[in-house]
Amino acid sequence: LRQLPLMLLPVLGLLSTACSDDHNTTQEPTTPEVPNIPESEPEPIAGCSLWQDYLAARANGEETTLLDFSYAGYEHGERGIPDVDYPVYLVEDYGAVANDNKSDREALEAAIEAATKAGGKAIIRFSAGRYDLRPADAPNKSIIINGDNIILQGAGSGEGGTEIFMEYPNTIVQPNVLWSGPDLIRFTYLGANSDNQLLLTNVTGNAARGSHSLEVASTSGLYIGQRLLLKGGSKSADAIAQEVAPYDVVTSEWKTFINEGVQVNEYLTIERIEGNTLRFKEPLMHSVDASWGWTLHRFQHHVGCGIEDIAFRGNFHEPYIHHEPSGIHDSGYKMIAFHRQANGWIRRCRFIDVIEAASVMLSANVSVIDCSIEGQKGHAAIRSEASSHVLLANINDMAGQEHSTGVSKTSIGTVIMNCTTAATSTFESHSSQPRATLIDKCSGGFLPNHAGGDVTFGPNHLADLVLWNYTETGTSVGEFNLWTRNNRFLKPIIAGFQGATTFNADQVTVDLSHGTMVEPLCLYQAQLQTRLRKVTSWLTNLK
């Protein structure tokens, strides 16, 4: 077990002892208020040895083998997604007519414009029926939502509810870039600056994996509650080798990793400022070596946006071909993108006959819960891409997308909980340096060559992949090679794996209780209740 010292300070509230003169920087809009509901004390969990080691190391201020994943999701898991009471903008009032086989795109765009001009805090509501947002003559681009606290709301995603129809596919906008087809609907922050333009300060001190504090050169322009982007990286051969140890660097495959170096991106929230030391709400999911030249940047984003109670139907009915040359099978029917969002959500939605359901990109603390992917198999399900502390829960990939629910790029701190996929597919881990992913009480196939990502962007997943009480369905490949071309997972932590697949002991950090579930049954829930010292009602009420 890792036993490095850890600066675990008790949470004393949001205290500022060293704010700069320009502390009055405009702060982000607040997310919707949720009434405080009395919650009960959790019962102690005896748990397996990994859990006991986690509790002991946490109590002693030592680095834990299991990272603390409990900060994932809307409001860091501390509150449930709210049922907001915002002004309602009915798309019918802007010209939409359900079930008339005509375009409703212009009506939706007019409703979005009105809600945005009014300052957000708006529900854009669809009544029951089908609304066509991508007829033949529609432009080959996304419908953009660029604002705070804007909710797309339907009348339910089941029979008799609201259906948004993508009748025709969007086509690729970059020649030969098969994944460049625009999303149907894109929540985004338009006009974002480059990270270099948003630089705030340099990191001057080292920090252990799992700690909450960083020493910086200056706190000027920083304030309590501010979300930041922590960036670290190194092109040195030693850093790259350290990142994949104990394995050797695969120079014949990892061209991007070798040329661009180690890249770590984490979105963090300032909880306290003490001199030149920042205390963050979230734990650092990667150790910080100041010699790499770590930096902190402003995070330009929107907050409090959501989608709920809508069925999204594509029009894809061909046998799926991975990387089919036209790009339609890679990105023709992509439905939703959450880009530069925080404290947002997608819930109670269905995705039918789609190439890709949803991507959460460059975002933090977004929850996607109670969703399903159905109908014709396509390319991808729902992913966290280059995001931090995203919660993907209760997602049922019945279509068996080529890459099921998972992660890509520099995602970190992702929790995939109680998700299922068909026996013919496996969770996505799409290379380009994802780290610290908890796959918690999930079930589905466990097959090679479904993680995704060209070998030049490998490995598929770096440190701190945790498989907790995973139930394998379908055919087993026998011993799963966790370190081979297109299937490179850096020594995952495995506990309670159920299925015929086995693992080489040299390729895992631990393979505990193989064939039998471990306690706690759900690691995210146990870690959250341990941190909050209460049973979280929103989580226990999650179906």
Model-derived features: positions:
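C-terminal motif of bacterial Sec signal peptides marking the signal peptidase cleavage site
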Residues: 15-18
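Gly/Ser/Thr/Ala-enriched C-terminal appendages of enzymes
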Residues: 415-543
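Extracellular "leader-to-stem" segments immediately downstream of a signal peptide or signal-anchor
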Residues: 20-309, 313-324, 493-543
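Bacterial N-terminal signal peptides that target proteins for export
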Residues: 1-6
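Right-handed parallel beta-helix
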Residues: 149, 154, 226, 232-264, 271, 303-394, ...
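Structured core elements
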Residues: 125, 229, 269, 279, ...
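Glycine-rich beta-solenoid repeat tracts in large extracellular/virion proteins
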Residues: 141-146, 159-192, 295-300, 319-322, ...
